[in-house]
Amino acid sequence: GRPETRIACRIHDECNGSDVFGSDICTCRPYLTHAIEECILGAQNGGVGLVAYSRKEGRALGEVTKFLVYNARKRQVGGDTADQYFARTECVAGVQDMRFQELMPDVLHWFGITKIDRLVSMSNMKYDAITGSGIAVGERVDLPDYLIPDDARVEIDAKTAAGYFTSGVIPDADELRKAKGRGLTT
């Protein structure tokens, strides 16, 4: 690529439940649509927009395991809370996340990308893999609060408290206990 060309980019990890079927337990679909809008805006302003879709369903644990985790979250004593978000995955799957992001930037290198002006991602694993592969990142774009579904508040609060990038407020331990998802009967 040409160094003067501005690039907006999202590497999106597959989420059939949200991306395809519209589940609101996570922020995947709103983040994907927000990224597409950001990429279109970048292209309309003379730059390039790129969304790469990675087949890493359910943090690379697979769809069945992801749905087992969702079930455990909704059925746990006290309900689905942000302070237990990662613990439920670890309890069901033995790990919090199986994604190996170190090879993910290969698709960017294949396109000749040496810098990303606007990385539409809150994931530090993706950011670290991209910058660690020699691609410079200018600005990180988080998901605006108004796009976060109510039931996904559990996910986003847990992730930002765990260190995911945000330009907003990082919830403390009390707020994590209060962030509660929809129950089984609602």
Question: Which residues does each predicted region cover?
Answer:
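Catalytic domains of riboflavin
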Residues: 1-186
